[in-house]
Amino acid sequence: MDSNLRVTVWNEGRHEQTNPIVQKIYPAGLHQPIVTHLQKLGMNVRSATLDEPDHGLTPPVLSETDVLIWWGHRAHDAVRDDIVSQVQQRVIQDGMGLVVLHSGHFSKIFKRLMGTSCDLKWREAGERERIWVVEPGH
C-alpha cells in the first residue's frame, strides 16, 4: 500500500460554469489549485465534481480516500442523499477525514455530521467573549 496520504478534492463546479471572471481565474476549476498544491507536497490527490457520475464519489474512490476536501457554495441540494450517506459512513465508521471549505458548512454532509441546521448566527453587541481551553495539548 502507498504510504502517501490519499486526498480527494470535491468541488460543485457551479461558479466556473456560470461566472466569466471565475472561469478566467480558474479555467480548470476552483479545486485545481488545491489539487496542484497538495500534489507538490507529495500527496496522492484526485478531484471529483458534482457533474460526474455519482458526483465523482464512487465507492472505489471513497474507499481509496484518506481525506476528502469538500468545496461547495450554492449547489448543496443537488448532491444526492445516497452519496451523502456513503461519505458519512466513510467518515464515521471508517475514519476518513473531511475538510469542509467555504460555504460547505451548509452542505448536506456537514449538516448531517453535525446534526444541526448549521445556520450561521451571530450578534454584535460589544460583549466580551470567553474561550476556555479544556485540553491544551490536543
Task: Outline where the language-model segments fall.
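Aromatic-Pro/Gly-enriched surface loop or interdomain linker
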Residues: M1-E64
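Glycine-rich, phosphate-binding/catalytic loops in enzymes
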Residues: I25-P27, V84-Q89, G115-C118
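A structural signal for well-ordered alpha-helical segments within the folded catalytic domains
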Residues: A28-Q32, S85, K108, V134
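Glycine-rich loops and low-complexity Gly/Arg-rich segments
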Residues: H31-V35, W70-R74, Q93-G95, R123-E127
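Short C-terminal domain-edge/linker segments immediately following a structured domain
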Residues: T36-N44, V79, L98-G104, E129-V134
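Short alpha-beta junction capping motif
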Residues: L62-K111
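An acidic, glycine-rich "communication" segment
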Residues: H105-H138
